[in-house]
A protein has these predicted regions:
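Catalytic alpha/beta core domains of metabolic enzymes, predominantly
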Residues: 64-72, 77-195
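Active-site beta->alpha loop and helix N-cap motifs at the rims of alpha/beta catalytic domains
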Residues: 1-87
């Protein structure tokens, strides 16, 4: 925290402080409290310690941590300690009030789309989506995702053939381990993707 305070003194825009949170609920809630006390902005919650827990237990765990501190969900690929999480998990996760973002790193297009669709269908426009899919960075950043989120309204004289309600979501940035080495170039690439 002291290093970040020093770095912020020389910046026009302050750093966003996201700390890691791990462990089962007792440990994770303690870590969330520490991040809060250190004036971080949010905590990236690893579910690795609960890899065998049923979804109901995972949601209860996430809610307990979110009661203490703003939460960034983390979808980590199974090959490195994560687990497959269905659309239904992410739809319920989106209902947790203090969720501010999700880092998606399942390295699987369909699992990534499950998260994006769950957030789009939840109506939570305040949840930011970040890619951690090192194998698909640029496409994740460039692709708009559009989903039908509601039925069409009744026909009217102005709209005799109403269309279903849709929602578009975009992945707004990358939270990638290797980007910490090439930060300047990564930021330039992100800006080019957004242009």
């Amino acid at each position: 925290a002291e290093e970040m305070d020093r770095a912020d003194r020389d910046r026009g825009v302050p750093l966003v402080r996201i700390g890691g949170i791990a462990g089962k609920t007792d440990q994770a809630t303690r870590e969330a409290g520490i991040l809060r006390d250190l004036k971080y902005h949010a905590g990236l919650l690893s579910l690795g310690a609960m890899s065998k827990a049923p979804d109901d237990e995972l949601i209860a765990h996430c809610k307990a941590v979110a009661e203490i501190f703003p939460l960034v969900g983390f979808y980590l690929q199974p090959a490195v300690g994560g687990r497959a999480l269905p659309y239904s998990f992410w739809r319920r996760f989106a209902e947790i009030e203090n969720v501010v973002a999700i880092k998606m790193a399942p390295f699987n297009r369909y699992q990534t789309l499950d998260v994006v669709r769950a957030i789009a269908e939840s109506g939570r426009d305040d949840i930011a989506l970040y890619t951690g899919n090192d194998d698909n960075i640029v496409m994740d950043l460039l692709t708009p995702h559009r989903f039908v989120v509601g039925p069409p309204g009744p026909p009217t004289p102005a709209t005799p053939h109403p269309v279903p309600k849709t929602s578009e979501r975009r992945i707004v940035g990358g939270l990638l381990g290797h980007w910490s080495v090439w930060t300047k170039t990564a930021v330039e690439l992100l800006e080019r993707c957004k242009a």
